[in-house]
């Protein structure tokens, strides 16, 4: 049996929507999944052996239902090449179904592994388009690929994205409750239509959110994170979230909102207040759920 060299990739967790930036804004966090692939010629891709360590061990699907393998197959199909199966090792730090981009991380991992196997024929923008097609929206995918704070839009079936560096003095404080909330279920909670007033308010809010990041003014985040499109409809699905958010606000965070579609809550703060804010968020959740806490810088690559 001929065994080839090992290929590898590391992909960050991401927080998407970021309050008023529904389906368009995302940011990479300093928490990572790693994926390693060793080709074995005698195996077909979907018959690859998968070893999973960390988050998702015992839960993540194998075979044709595995998202890493699906992305590998999609990239191979796009470039017109066939890649063999092999030994796939996943070392996961990103919690599943918590609003931290676990599915995007899996798809990006597979796309990058396949691109390496095919000779690195695709650039990052081409990978972004392929993975967005698989994921359905670019808000998590873009920061998983480019890092930093990304704003993205799909225009004529092509993803346009720009990246901005989050201020070094900001900390992301992430409270992760011990239950899952599937993106599909969170989307079902949203209304089919919105009032003009709500849409105008969100346009104004996202303008302040962009100003906060680009001008490095944390005090603008409270206005910038105020959302009327998804947050009010998803909060009732997350027991303890309102208490966690109120506690973070009382402790002086710049702003706080749902991470992705939830149930994770993310606050932004100065480094000096990060621990105190995180403890207050955990305290808000503790009447309902056990809660994990991460304090992170933005990941820039």
Give, region by region, the residue ranges found by the protein language model.
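Short, well-ordered amphipathic alpha-helical segments that serve as non-catalytic structural scaffolds
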Residues: 67-76, 206, 244, 281
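Helix N-cap motif at beta-to-alpha junctions
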Residues: 270-274
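ATP-binding N-lobe of GHMP and related small-molecule kinases
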Residues: 1-98, 120-122
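DPxDG-like acidic metal-binding loop motif
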Residues: 31, 100-123, 145-147, 155
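Conserved, helical-rich catalytic subdomain that frames metal- and/or nucleotide-binding sites
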Residues: 175-176, 187-251
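Conserved small/polar residues in nucleotide/adenosyl-binding loops
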Residues: 294-299
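Alpha/beta catalytic cores of group-transfer enzymes, especially the acyltransferase/condensing modules
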Residues: 122-168, 236, 256-258, 266
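Short amphipathic alpha-helices in soluble, non-transmembrane regions
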Residues: 277-285
């Amino acid at each position: 049996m001929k065994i080839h060299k090992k290929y590898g990739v590391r992909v960050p967790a991401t927080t998407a929507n970021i309050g008023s930036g529904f389906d368009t804004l995302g940011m990479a966090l300093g928490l990572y999944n790693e994926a390693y692939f060793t080709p074995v010629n005698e195996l077909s891709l979907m018959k690859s052996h998968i070893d999973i360590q960390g988050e998702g061990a015992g839960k993540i699907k194998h075979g044709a239902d595995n998202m890493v393998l699906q992305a590998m197959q999609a990239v191979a199909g796009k470039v017109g090449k066939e890649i063999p199966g092999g030994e796939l090792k996943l070392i996961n730090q990103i919690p599943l179904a918590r609003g931290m981009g676990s599915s995007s991380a899996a798809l990006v991992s597979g796309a990058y592994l396949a691109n390496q196997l095919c000779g690195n024929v695709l650039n990052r923008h081409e990978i972004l388009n392929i993975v967005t097609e698989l994921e359905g929206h670019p808000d998590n995918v873009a920061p998983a690929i480019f890092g930093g704070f990304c704003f993205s839009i799909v225009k004529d079936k092509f993803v346009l994205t720009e990246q901005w560096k989050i201020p070094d003095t900001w900390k992301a404080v992430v409270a992760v409750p011990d239950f899952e909330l599937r993106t599909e279920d969170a989307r079902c909670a949203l209304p089919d239509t919105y009032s003009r007033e709500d849409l105008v308010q969100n346009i104004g809010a996202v303008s302040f959110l962009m100003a906060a990041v680009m001008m490095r003014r944390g005090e603008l985040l409270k206005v910038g994170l105020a959302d009327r499109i998804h947050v009010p409809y998803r909060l009732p699905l997350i027991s303890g979230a309102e208490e966690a958010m109120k506690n973070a606000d009382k402790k002086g965070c710049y702003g706080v909102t749902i991470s992705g579609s939830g149930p994770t809550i993310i606050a932004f703060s100065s480094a000096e207040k990060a621990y105190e804010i995180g403890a207050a968020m955990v305290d808000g959740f503790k009447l309902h759920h056990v809660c994990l806490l991460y304090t992170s810088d933005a990941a820039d690559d």
